[in-house]
Amino acid sequence: MELKDYYAIMGVKPTDDLKTIKTAYRRLARKYHPDVSKEPDAEARFKEVAEAWEVLSDEQRRAEYDQMWQHRNDPQFNRQFHHGDGQSFNAEDFDDIFSSIFGQHARQSRQRPATRGHDIEIEVAVFLEETLTEHKRTISYNLPVYNAFGMIEQEIPKTLNVKIPAGVGNGQRIRLKGQGTPGENGGPNGDLWLVIHIAPHPLFDIVGQDLEIVVPVSPWEAALGTKVTVPTLKESILLTIPPGSQAGQRLRVKGKGLVSKKQTGDLYAVLKIVMPPKPDENTAALWQQLADAQSSFDPRKDWGKA
């Protein structure tokens, strides 16, 4: 089995400390990461750098490797290698020596199964108005780089231009195949999942596929009826308030709710009767006239009755 020059692979000296080697590893891992580098051998170089870091980052493995490297050209090396504790290893045990250093990576590298990369989830905020039509979005996220021990060593920024389809809902997940972390040993990349978060709207509340909006009206508008301008997600409409409308009454506007592949929801205007400020003497007199004219009306007549 070939004994690679890990120091040369990392571009460092055997006398360099761990901090220097770690800096070199991060630089090379970023340079040869398959999702960043355009070089044809980037994936192979990336794995080679990761293999070197796996050994040189561990004090015991590095010491064993250094001893092996020192005796690599010794004729006795092919027949017998002396471990630091005096134990002898024959040439047929050479693979076992590698296994003790590499955690059996060297022996099993050809036998290890292909492993799929990790999935990544990021939250994407979408405004209600944007749900009506397909739109493009530029998203940025950090792509984790895992070392040989399965720990995140660093994160590489990545940017994608994606399409957000019409009709997305809160909590919906959109899959971008292969945009997660790279697989190992020829395994496929993981996926990127966009988790949709519908941003709160200052006017509209979401109720399933429907929208609700509170429409303030005056007492006389509710009593006599009127037309008021009401906003929707697309444009404003003229809403008819029928005479005798009540506070909390819901007026349906068909087809002005949320859009999905299966259906389009409705908009419900919820009436809120707003009293004017404290009346002056003339206004109070008018209210009194109204009260006298409606003296037989008792709004609490059925109050508390089943």
From Swiss-Prot:
Question: Main role?
Answer: DNA-binding protein that preferentially recognizes a curved DNA sequence. It is probably a functional analog of DnaJ; displays overlapping activities with DnaJ, but functions under different conditions, probably acting as a molecular chaperone in an adaptive response to environmental stresses other than heat shock. Lacks autonomous chaperone activity; binds native substrates and targets them for recognition by DnaK. Its activity is inhibited by the binding of CbpM.
Q: Where in the cell is it found?
A: Cytoplasm, Nucleoid
CDD domains from the UniProt entry: DnaJ (cd06257), DnaJ_C (cd10747)
- SUPFAM superfamilies assigned: Chaperone J-domain, HSP40/DnaJ peptide-binding domain
* Assigned keywords, A-Z: Chaperone, Cytoplasm, DNA-binding
In terms of HAMAP family, this protein maps to: CbpA
Q: Which GO terms describe its cellular component?
A: cytoplasm; nucleoid
MF terms (GO), sorted A to Z: bent DNA binding; unfolded protein binding
Q: Which GO BP annotation is one of this protein's?
A: protein refolding
> J domain location, by residue?
5-69
Q: What is this protein called?
A: Curved DNA-binding protein
Q: Which positions form S-S bridges?
A: none
**Parts of the chain that traverse the membrane:** none
Q: Which InterPro entries match?
A: DNA-bd_curved-DNA, DnaJ_C, DnaJ_domain, DnaJ_domain_CS, HSP40/DnaJ_pept-bd, J_dom_sf
Q: Which domain of life is it from?
A: Bacteria
